[in-house]
From Swiss-Prot:
Protein's GO biological process: thiamine biosynthetic process; thiamine diphosphate biosynthetic process; thiazole biosynthetic process
Top EC class for this record: transferase
Organism from which the protein derives: Pyrococcus horikoshii (strain ATCC 700860 / DSM 12428 / JCM 9974 / NBRC 100139 / OT-3)
Annotated NAD(+) binding sites: 35, 54-55, 62, 126, 152-154, 217
Biological role: Involved in the biosynthesis of the thiazole moiety of thiamine. Catalyzes the conversion of NAD and glycine to adenosine diphosphate 5-(2-hydroxyethyl)-4-methylthiazole-2-carboxylate (ADT), an adenylated thiazole intermediate, using free sulfide as a source of sulfur.
Cofactor: Fe(2+)
Binding site for Fe cation: 154, 169
Entries under InterPro entries matching the protein: FAD/NAD-bd_sf (IPR036188), Thi4_fam (IPR002922), Thi4_prok (IPR022828)
Subunit comment: Homooctamer; tetramer of dimers.
Name of one Pfam family that matches: Thi4
Pathway(s) annotated for this protein in UniProt: Cofactor biosynthesis; thiamine diphosphate biosynthesis
Name of the protein: Thiamine thiazole synthase
SUPFAM superfamilies recorded: FAD/NAD(P)-binding domain (SSF51905)
Amino acid sequence: MLREVTITRAIVESYYRDLLNNLELDVAIVGAGPSGMVAAYYLAKGGAKVAIFEKKLSIGGGIWGGGMGFNKVVVQDEAREILDEFGIRYEEFEKGYYVADAIEVATTIASKVVKSGVKIFNMIEVEDLVIKDNRVSGIVINWTPVLMAGLHVDPLTIEAKYVIDSTGHGAQVAQFLVKRGLLKEIPGEGAMWAEQGEKLTVKNTREVFPGLYVTGMAANAIAGAPRMGPIFGGMFLSGRKAAQEILKKLKS
């Protein structure tokens, strides 16, 4: 016989256990878009304890819609090896241009991330940062519906040695530092220029404040660099670069 209360208990107890197990992290990633998920995968693969916090109900960021709702994405030569590592199928459109199904990209990356040991907490929004001794030391979290409704409910905190801002165009985590005068004003992304946007996304992936890395479009927003549209190689390479740099620091 199925009992509703047993179903409820199973959900509450297992979620509670997951949350307790992720209160202290090596890396807390904010945003489950392409760069954030790829960073999580490589961090977990390197032995780091990592979790992702996504404010929306769904994960994947801008992958799902491809270009203008045509659910295909393009990846260039430099990032093709990442598609291969994740086992994502693609076809060559022209030399140096590879096309993949956006749904396969989003679901395959997400599956690999979860199976690598990363816990993704969706519907949880980061509303502030923990800052101690002039260093980002964690994130302040609350339920997305609570913040959407404007309810006065105090948040909880997650401790982390490093935080990654993978929130995309708004660079929402870095904005908390701007608000407190700890980071200069964020100019936002520039106009579309795919080639430069892709290169600069990787170049701008860095630690912008002690304990805080930026990846993907958040990295370009902070630098005022161009947007690039539905080509995702830069996002993937950005996530991998952040993971590699953080792993070196964790092991030093």
